[in-house]
A protein has these predicted regions:
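A short beta-strand element within beta-rich, extracytoplasmic domains
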Residues: 65-80
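Serine-esterase "nucleophile elbow" of acetyl-processing enzymes
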Residues: 115, 140-214
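Oxyanion-hole/transition-state-stabilizing segment in secreted/luminal serine hydrolases
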Residues: 168, 217-278, 303-305
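Catalytic His-Asp segment of secreted/periplasmic serine-dependent ester chemistry enzymes
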Residues: 216, 303-383
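Active-site segments of SGNH/GDSL-like serine hydrolases
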Residues: 260-269, 284-318
């Protein structure tokens, strides 16, 4: 402003800087799927959570007064080709690439009020996952100024689903990889509706004695020699608590209500020694029972294995699985919480039909056909 030839400064009130809120991974508003995430300090730490498991999830709850809310999930993966899918207040955004930096802006926020974001690790290349080179890392959720966290519901009784490429959703999206199209996800939604949480620990190429990932970097579930996977989340993080029990987050008293084991396909495809597989099954069941004394354990005969059009040697491996579980039960007659479930040859032939995929990996319709059968098998065992 100019007055009598003198330039006077304009008096202006500075606008306050925008102060976005970032919820850390330790926020009460956040919850991570049990038994599948490692932290920056063992199972915990205040900085980050990471997982290589497709099908793992995290959920965030908050409320905002803003008519134009924003949210950005602080997630990265250094390996190209990985993706997540998320549900915002029930609406699905599918197949979102995970960047090497910068996180993912959440689409669809359009109104004030309470919001819930559930993020699923959808797919990643089957390589370098065990040592964290190919892992999703989450450091928080950044929200608009004025947003406030709201508490996430506590962990409920939970179910651990273990398996191979079929369980992690390879080719499940009608030829494309997606953990949201596989039976494990669908069984998980049924478990949620029945009042349970769930988690998926699955790796392609793996089995009772077969290592996982294309180059074999993920250990077999329990080989007779070498590194085991049953009691680890990744190469550096144990799945057990201080007592040696399976634990959702590392605390005592967090054992799963049930475990479903779906292995044997890769042993069959690779002509693995059936006696070695049998011994591994017995060792797995013995170890799991020691680490989860009251948990319902179900060994599932891989549902397609009886179809000799796809698995010429399938019946021999089915026989080996039956024999292994029978041998364990004979040695542990008081353990009535460990069973084998065989859905039978009709289910196998259905999965082998072209409409359901017609091969080793079912398509979405095949997984949808399979899911209620497996869900019933799991729920029928839980008191």
């Amino acid at each position: 402003m100019v007055l009598m030839g003198v330039v006077l400064p304009l008096c202006m009130t500075a606008l306050p800087a925008r102060a976005d809120l970032t919820l850390p991974v330790t926020s009460p508003a956040a919850r991570f799927s049990p038994a599948t995430w490692a932290g920056d300090a063992g199972r915990g730490g205040a900085v980050s959570r990471r997982t290589w498991n497709n099908g793992a999830w995290c959920v965030w709850h908050w409320s905002t007064p803003s008519p134009h809310p924003t949210a950005r999930l602080q997630i990265t993966n250094q390996t190209p080709g990985s993706a997540v899918s998320y549900f915002l207040d029930g609406a699905l955004t599918d197949d979102v690439p995970v960047p090497a930096s910068g996180g993912i802006p959440i689409a669809g926020l359009a109104a004030p009020g309470p919001h819930t974001l559930t993020v699923y690790t959808r797919n990643s290349p089957q390589t370098d996952r065990w040592r964290g080179t190919n892992a999703y890392t989450v450091t928080g959720l950044t929200l608009d100024d004025g947003a406030k966290p709201t508490p996430a519901p506590p962990l409920r009784h939970w179910v651990l689903i273990v398996g191979d490429s079929i369980t992690e959703g390879i080719q499940a999206d009608d030829g494309r990889d997606s953990s949201l199209c596989d039976y494990a996800f669908l069984v998980g939604q049924g478990l949620n509706a029945a009042g349970f949480d769930y988690t998926v620990s699955a790796c392609g190429y793996s089995g009772w004695v077969r290592p996982g990932d294309a180059q074999g970097d993920v250990p077999a579930y329990l080989p007779l020699l070498g590194v085991q996977r049953w009691n680890m989340i990744d190469a550096d993080t144990r799945l057990l608590d201080s007592r040696g029990h399976l634990s959702a987050y590392g605390g005592i008293g967090q054992e799963p209500a049930a475990i479903l084991l779906n292995y044997g396909v890769n042993e069959c495809l690779n002509h693995s020694d059936k006696a070695a597989m049998r011994d591994s099954v017995i060792s797995v069941l013995t170890a799991l029972r020691r680490a989860a004394p009251r948990t319902e354990i179900t060994v599932l005969v891989p549902p397609g294995l009886a179809d000799t059009r796809i698995y010429p040697n399938g019946p021999a491996y089915i026989t080996a699985l039956h024999a292994a579980v029978a041998a364990y039960q004979a040695a542990h007659p008081d353990d009535r919480k460990t069973v084998l479930v065989d859905l039978g040859p009709d289910v196998a032939r259905a999965l082998g039909s072209p409409a359901y995929g017609g091969g080793v990996h079912p398509h979405a319709a095949g997984h949808a056909y399979l899911a209620p059968l497996i869900l019933q098998a799991v729920l029928s065992r839980i008191p």
